[in-house]
Amino acid sequence: MNPEPVVLINAFEVPDGQEEEFLAAWERARAFLATQPGYLSTRLHRSLSPTADFRFVNVAVWQSPQAFQAATSQPEFAAAPVPFPFHASLYQVVHQDQR
């Protein structure tokens, strides 16, 4: 039996005026990670509040913690970091509701 996928939630601190720089760096990282084994999906969210501490929040789904760790340990990923402070962790879904 395969374990449930894990969810990466990554909140980014992006100063005013640096949104385009952030988006370009995030897209480079996303393009690489999307080619890695175990990658399932990602969604980037932008805050509606201009005063939010975290202007962007990425929610990605990976097949396993090991797949995520392997992908982010690749030299290609380390060579092109997203140059903004971030707060990331892997999560398990404990409840889901949908209409």
For each of these PLM feature ranges, what is it?
Residues M1-V6, R43-F54, A79-R99:
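Glycine-rich beta-strand-turn "strand-cap" elements at beta-sheet edges
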Residues P5-E13, R43-S73:
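Short, well-ordered beta-strand segments in beta-rich or mixed alpha/beta enzyme
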Residues D16-S41, E76-P81:
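Short amphipathic alpha-helical segments
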Residues F22, R30, Q66-F68, H95:
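Short, isolated positions within intrinsically disordered regulatory regions of eukaryotic proteins
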Residues F32, N58-V59, S64, V82-H87:
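Juxtamembrane helix-loop transition sites at the ends of transmembrane segments
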